Amino acid sequence: MATLVVNKLGAGVDSGRQGSRGTAVVKVLECGVCEDVFSLQGDKVPRLLLCGHTVCHDCLTRLPLHGRAIRCPFDRQVTDLGDSGVWGLKKNFALLELLERLQNGPIGQYGAAEESIGISGESIIRCDEDEAHLASVYCTVCATHLCSECSQVTHSTKTLAKHRRVPLADKPHEKTMCSQHQVHAIEFVCLEEGCQTSPLMCCVCKEYGKHQGHKHSVLEPEANQIRASILDMAHCIRTFTEEISDYSRKLVGIVQHIEGGEQIVEDGIGMAHTEHVPGTAENARSCIRAYFYDLHETLCRQEEMALSVVDAHVREKLIWLRQQQEDMTILLSEVSAACLHCEKTLQQDDCRVVLAKQEITRLLETLQKQQQQFTEVADHIQLDASIPVTFTKDNRVHIGPKMEIRVVTLGLDGAGKTTILFKLKQDEFMQPIPTIGFNVETVEYKNLKFTIWDVGGKHKLRPLWKHYYLNTQAVVFVVDSSHRDRISEAHSELAKLLTEKELRDALLLIFANKQDVAGALSVEEITELLSLHKLCCGRSWYIQGCDARSGMGLYEGLDWLSRQLVAAGVLDVA
């Protein structure tokens, strides 16, 4: 066993320096075989032999076995192990309790300088010479805390006056003693990769212990390097903390702007009062309410207008039907009278029948004329109680089986406008002939009746296009996909077309014609060359590849127009 001096921090110093009142003498028991300090657990746990000696667990496992027994290394007494071996030997609990007290409990009356916490939270250290005084300096040679008065008294001799005394703030760190070799201070750090033990080591650990042959460095430079990295990390953490705090403040401000709240303001006479400040959420809700209120008002007006159109149609239709009822009543009365007159004539004698010949002839001629008129009226008038209703995209109502749409077909000369028109009208191919003036045809498709105006595309006729814009609901612009050199000219004319105020709300359908010709531009290429996404921004437009000869793609274009123009299909209202 060896004698160590343990201070309050658990660090040991040489026993030759026991004269300081800031230290206490404590007997620390070591294993008598390996001379390592006993531990509370692990391989260095103290275990009792039958003879009363204590040896660490690790050394007991290394002793030679004599059957099922071992001999004490000190007095050679035999101890039976039993089935459990060394694990079955009792631990020295008295020694374990002492070790635990040394590690966790206070040192005693001769312990290191007592520290206490002041009211302000700062550490207060008592003077080692006079505990009534507060220490202000530290003697690095005596390792004592002293007040200024005691420092002068205790170091008044020439020998002790040479001791270095520093303020408590500059007190050097006390050396930490090695846990395995407590008489030696920790001086090195192990840098060996894969080392499983603690990196701290003394000179004995470095030369002879578990760190023998390991890479190492001196403790102080290694600690200073780690401190420098910690300082850098602390600076980064402070910067990061400031960024987080700034971002958090911004988040708080954003939340306040969204939620709104009460704000203290001053009026004209300097009186402070609270005022509600609406947030962006409340403003957004108000905007939505206002928008849908206006939308509701607009829909109500459109509903009233649509109902008035239906009422007018019903009123006119009922007036006409009642007029037809009156006409049919009169006609039926006349026919009945003529029939009755004929029956009476049949009952008279021959002379009177002969005399009534001319009258009967005129009566029959009148009946034949009335029958012919009735047949013509009945053939042209369909007696149907349904009221077909169609709604446009702008919520206007159209009554009738077909909704009429005015369409203007424009484009450069030779693009195939007239060919497309007659293919849709008569489903037959027409040889290209330059259009002088215009062509107009009606094309019925689904529940729509397109009135299509085909205007000539020669350069001298293009200024006349503007005369056909009035009340136009859709523009069909035809492009010749096979003539690359005229795409820029088509782009120029289309750009002029889209600046017309009368066509501001008109739909734009672009037919990329002659897709059957070899080398024709694709729809994507024409879209790019005409800059349609930029040119038609804010407008409802669509480009459709087609072939006027075969009709490919033409009805797909009409389908798009139908979907854009009609909000709902034809509704039969009984």
UniProtKB/Swiss-Prot annotation:
Coiled coil: 352-379
EC numbers for this chain: 2.3.2.27
Any one cellular-component term (Gene Ontology): nucleus
Effect after changing C34A: Loss of E3 ubiquitin-protein ligase activity
Record's catalysed reaction(s): S-ubiquitinyl-[E2 ubiquitin-conjugating enzyme]-L-cysteine + [acceptor protein]-L-lysine = [E2 ubiquitin-conjugating enzyme]-L-cysteine + N(6)-ubiquitinyl-[acceptor protein]-L-lysine
GO terms for biological process, alphabetical: innate immune response; intracellular protein transport; positive regulation of autophagy; protein ubiquitination; vesicle-mediated transport
Superkingdom in the source lineage: Eukaryota
GO molecular function: enzyme activator activity; GDP binding; GTP binding; GTPase activity; identical protein binding; ubiquitin protein ligase activity; ubiquitin-protein transferase activity; zinc ion binding
Transferase as UniProt keyword: yes
Pfam families per record: Arf, zf-B_box, zf-RING_UBOX
Keywords tagged on the record: Coiled coil, Cytoplasm, Golgi apparatus, GTP-binding, Host-virus interaction, Immunity, Innate immunity, Lysosome, Membrane, Metal-binding, Nucleotide-binding, Transferase, Ubl conjugation pathway, Zinc, Zinc-finger
Stretches annotated zinc finger (B box-type): 122-168
Residues annotated for GTP binding in this entry: 411-418, 454-458, 513-516
Zinc finger boundaries on the chain: RING-type: 31-76
Main localisation: cytoplasm
Cellular compartments annotated: Cytoplasm; Endomembrane system; Golgi apparatus membrane; Lysosome membrane
Residue ranges of the region described as ARF-like: 390-574
Pathway the protein takes part in: Protein modification; protein ubiquitination
Subunit structure: Homodimer. Interacts with PSCD1. Interacts with UBE2D2. Interacts with TBK1 (via N-terminal kinase domain) and p62/SQSTM1. (Microbial infection) Interacts with human cytomegalovirus protein UL144; this interaction might cause autoubiquitination of TRAF6, leading to NF-kappa-B activation.
Family stated for the protein in its record: In the C-terminal section; belongs to the small GTPase superfamily. Arf family.
Protein function: Acts as an E3 ubiquitin-protein ligase. Plays an essential role in autophagy activation during viral infection. Mechanistically, activates TANK-binding kinase 1/TBK1 by facilitating its dimerization and ability to phosphorylate the selective autophagy receptor SQSTM1. In order to achieve this function, TRIM23 mediates 'Lys-27'-linked auto-ubiquitination of its ADP-ribosylation factor (ARF) domain to induce its GTPase activity and its recruitment to autophagosomes.
Domain remark text: The RING-type zinc finger domain is responsible for E3 ubiquitin ligase activity. This domain is catalytically active as a dimer.
Name of the protein in its database record: E3 ubiquitin-protein ligase TRIM23
Organism: Homo sapiens (Human)
Lineage: Eukaryota, Metazoa, Chordata, Craniata, Vertebrata
